[in-house]
Amino acid sequence: MSKLPLGKRLKIRSMVHMAAEPIPNFWPMRTFIHHNPLHGLEHLPFEQAVRQGEKLFHARGFLPREDYQRYHKEGRVDQNSIKRDIADFISKQETLNGLDLASLLSDLMCSVKNKVTRTRALADHDDVFQALHGKQLENAEALDLKALTQRLCAQFAPERPLYEAIDLLFGTQMGTTLDELVIKSCLDFFDEGQSTIQMPGRHQGLFAAWTALAKRNLRLFLRGMHIKQILDQDDTPEGIIAYILDELGIEEAHWDGLITRELTRLHGWAGFIRWRSSSKHYYWAEQYPGDLIDFLAIRLVLGLALIREHSRQKRTPMTVKVLQEYIEGHTAECYLRQAYYGGCILPAFAHDVDDALSHKKPQRINNILPGYLRQQRQFEATRQADALRDLASKAGQTDALMALNAPQIKQLMTLIEAFENEEGMIWLRAMESVYRREIINQIQLYAPHKKEKRPFAQALFCIDVRSEPIRRNLETVGEYQTYGIAGFFGVPVSYIGLGKGSEVNLCPVVITPKNLVLEVPVGATSIETDFYSSADHVLHEMKSSILSPYFTVEAAGLLFGFDMIGKTIAPRRYTQIRNHIEPKAQATRLLVDKLTREQADSIVRSLQRAMIVRAIHQEFGIEREAVTDAMIRELREAAMDNYHEQTEFARRFALSPTAETQFIAGLKKDYKINRSFVSMQMERLARIGFSLDEQVFYVDKALTSIGLTENFSRFVLLAGHGSTSDNNPYESALDCGACGGSHGLVSARVLAHMANKPEVRRRLAKQGIQIPEDTWFVSVMHNTTTDQLSLQDLDLLPNSHLVYLERLRNGLRAATRLSAAERLPALLDHPSPNIDTLSAQKQIERNASDWTQVRPEWGLARNASVVAGGRHLTEGANLSGRTFLQSYDYRLDPKGRHLENILSNPLIIGQWINLEHYFSAVDNEHFGSGSKAYHNVVGRFGVVTGNLSDLRTGLPAQSVLKDGRPYHEPIRLLAIIEAPAAFTLEVAGRLPKVMSLITNGWITVVVVDPETGDRLFYDRGEWYNLNNDPQYTPSVKPLLEEELSA
């Protein structure tokens, strides 16, 4: 029983959940979901959130100045934008006579490598003024112990974990030890089948299972960590949290801040646990529950045990109060300790300080301190003066600087510090200005001309930026018309693949699907047979493994050896040979249609009969051939309370009335053959498939949302996309974000099935969408690693279309080769200038098969914009694979429902992808996941660096950096929307989340108004017409009224 009242326990749970808000969720790697690392701070303006994120995650929110300066030299930065922002900044400052601040700040950005304002613990502006003029510092020997004490106590605020303060003062490294112990505990508990030894008692939950082990952990006890004494104080994680925080002497007012700091030390693990505990249908979470309250309690237990261990061994403080008293009583010692163990000691004093501290010589410490403070103060003042002098020299304003008096130097230093805090945003806006001008000047605002000739084929691609090159190239090789749509084709669905035991949600993570689709083999003798293998997971709560089948160590080793040799020496050829030798994948169909009640009832009965056969064999050892169908049917009726006489089974096998009653009771309880479970089974079966009304709705929605409602071609290709690469834990990060990090082919097959159904087409015709009889929707797999386009389910293709099939394949093949030749140079260190398309395709295929290849494709790197509008806006423009292309025609959307959907789904997903790349590029070590070369897969759900580290949550260096420099250009997503301005703002106003992202600057927006020709850009609370900016090419005249109504 907990000693803590229920109200206090609930308060602590709420406190932990609130403290975890800034920590983003982290999904398992097998379904990698792009996310904004600062998602929990999106309620703040972008610039403010970045600053807070820098403090929370000890990261950098903007590129180093040197990288921006390189972009500036390459013409990727708008100098006019920099000038405007500098002028705006200066207008808010007091003037400094004699200094040209505009020139000074411009040179600071473009000519000075390092920050001008330096960290100063002791030197003030008067000291800097003296150093600037080569004078000795005044009162250099002065020693204000009270001020030092206050500075030290402020440095060790109550929100800072006590062990961090002790580490900094005594070099104990408890924080590192604590992190390692917590990580090991997480690895043991959250493992999903990778480890050969499983942690016992996991079904009890994280805290209970860990407690049971920790109380008996002899190794920790022998080293002096008396964990059992702590755990005996309460048997709930909330009670333990309250006990420890009270024991450490931390006032409740500071609990929020301390909890956030504890969680962000391992924000990868915290993000995974946070996601896992909120995922209701995640198999491993259902089996082995654990949440952040458990995680925090374990961390605090281990932390307190370490603090007590070190206190006994090294006499370090055990509470916040004792720490403060120690600082007040040993100020000189603590000041030198934090400098020495913090790594910022002046080199000339390092040996003396080390000797004095290690031999505990108080008098010597007191003697060292005055000279140390004098030297540190002089060092800080001289370093700051040198930085100011260097800046003035580069700006040609040395005389003006030297003419400033001490108060003016203070004013200048304050001004420069404030400017350098804003500098990152100035660089960012200037880079965005260049890209915005480039893409807007490529947009063609003209009335779409109706083409009389029917296209040979129409193709619907995912809006993914990797679709832009293949779409553009496909349009150049023939009479192809392409569209952009979210990769789940607007149909949210859960999916169970053939032979799989778990559902996969194929839709954006912000949507929860209601319908379930099953994959079944072609040629099954009956629908019951299909379901018997595919629907077992849906109908029974059995522990089915989602892992690959086991095979012997010898066989695994042999296969591994062949793979290692083949995929290293000749990866492309080896893959071709292996694919030829291995059996082809079984042909399958998707169960897309809703079941009738008779079908569902037949399935339930079939499964119940199978369970009764299993029960008879398990309970009595009787084989199936000894039991008649009539016996099974009678037992089923008895279990369902429809039959109350002695059964034929009991008579045949001489069961006593008691044995028969017990067996039937077991059928009800253990084998789930009862009325309530049948009702639940029928409800679950009702999830399978889509009704006719639903199918009509989704096909209509998909077609009208992209403006494809007439002039259908013979082939309408639905291209779902995914990637192929070997030895790549981040493979799902290259798959379809709109499909929850899975391949998009299933979604394409689902919509194709619906759109090809005659009943659906008849209903659509009544709604005004006439799909010709000779139009056939074909699902296509778009492999983004190789740009291959593979036609699917061709056995369903009407005979009348076979004659056109080779022409279609030739066009797709040509587009593939053109795209390969376009993408290859960026993947090579030394690309050939004259590589032909066939050779490019072969090299791209080799990369996909080569498991030594750390970068099989660039994925979504360099993504920068999303365009929602007609293809005429960008047709013929080379957008360099940087743009999400969403087809949209506002004229078919009078109520704005389709635009609502685009803004609240594809735009949000695009923003997550964009900011994942942005932050992984600006600070790959903290927001990204570092180099793949040091990664190890853990638990089958994540990666760590080396053997032990926080879960790496962002993108690896190989996804965003090239030769150590950003390959991804880190700018915010630019949304370009083609629709009347008033209409767009009215629709966006219905979506508070979207408006918040716009007004807080997480995305930038340009509205292209086809009725007025205006191009309106939103920036910091104001709308600006880009037509008034001479840097933008003039837009064409507005569309004529008769054209709009045509």
From Swiss-Prot:
GO molecular function: zinc ion binding
An example Gene Ontology CC term for this record: plasma membrane
Location of the protein in the cell: Cell inner membrane
Disrupted gene: phenotype observed: Required for growth in ambient air.
Obligatory cofactor(s): Zn(2+)
Family note: Belongs to the inorganic carbon transporter (TC 9.A.2) DabA family.
UniProt membrane topology term: Peripheral membrane protein
Role according to the record: Part of an energy-coupled inorganic carbon pump.
Residues noted as binding Zn(2+) in the record, renumbered to the chain: 462, 464, 721, 736
Protein name: Probable inorganic carbon transporter subunit DabA1
Transmembrane segments: none
Subunit structure: Forms a complex with DabB1.
Organism whose genome encodes this protein: Halothiobacillus neapolitanus (strain ATCC 23641 / c2)
Record keywords: Cell inner membrane, Cell membrane, Membrane, Metal-binding, Transport, Zinc
